[in-house]
Amino acid sequence: MKKLFLTFLVLLSGFLLAQSADQKKILSDTQSFLDLFQKKDYEGIINMTHPAVVEKFDKQTMIAGFKNLLEGNEAYKIQLKNADKSAINVSDVFKTKETEYAFATYPITMIVTFMNEKLDESKQEAVKSVMQSKGMNPKFVNDNTLEMAKQSMVIALKDKSTGNEWKYLNYDESNMMLLFVVPVDAMAKAKEYYANFLNKQKENAN
């Protein structure tokens, strides 16, 4: 009986150490992911993104999209504020039959500057309403600068399709593509985990 207990203890400690190593990897990757966005390193961002997304949209199309979003255009420009990396939280690592997955939450703040327009109060309220519907906490710094804060989450996936390396997808419940990439069990868990996380954030804020 004692021998069986020791065997179980060794197996359990091995599992916990492996899980801890995966969690550390996901934490490190999420920190790097935020750095890459800050530096506008689009190749680096794409290298960390789940290959199904890259196959769907093509690398050059994705780079063009990132440039349009993060480098702005004649209408607006977007700046990402330095993220608080100490606020990144990584979940336990879960498993389906073929896929390992986990979640990493982090705060992100963006500053949007409207280049050719000053928004009056009614337009500001309309913009804020749209951003709030997307889970943002928006406030206007002045009549052409909007600051938006959000608690974001990425889904980390590891299976044969990722070359058994951790790859990442931004969690957005309205993004239908996630349904074709993320296993059903993992998607349900992501929805539950994110909702619980947001509820805890609200409780801590009160």
Predicted regions and their residues:
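Bacterial Sec-dependent N-terminal signal peptides
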Residues: 1-24
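Short, compositionally biased low-complexity segments
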Residues: 3, 35-44
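Short, low-complexity N-terminal intrinsically disordered segments enriched in polar/charged residues
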Residues: 18-35, 39
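Second-shell loop/turn segments in exported
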Residues: 20, 31-32, 48-55, 142
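Short solvent-exposed beta->alpha transition segments
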Residues: 27, 43-101
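Beta-strand elements of well-folded, non-transmembrane domains
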Residues: 108-114
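Low-complexity, intrinsically disordered terminal/linker segments enriched in charged
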Residues: 119-206
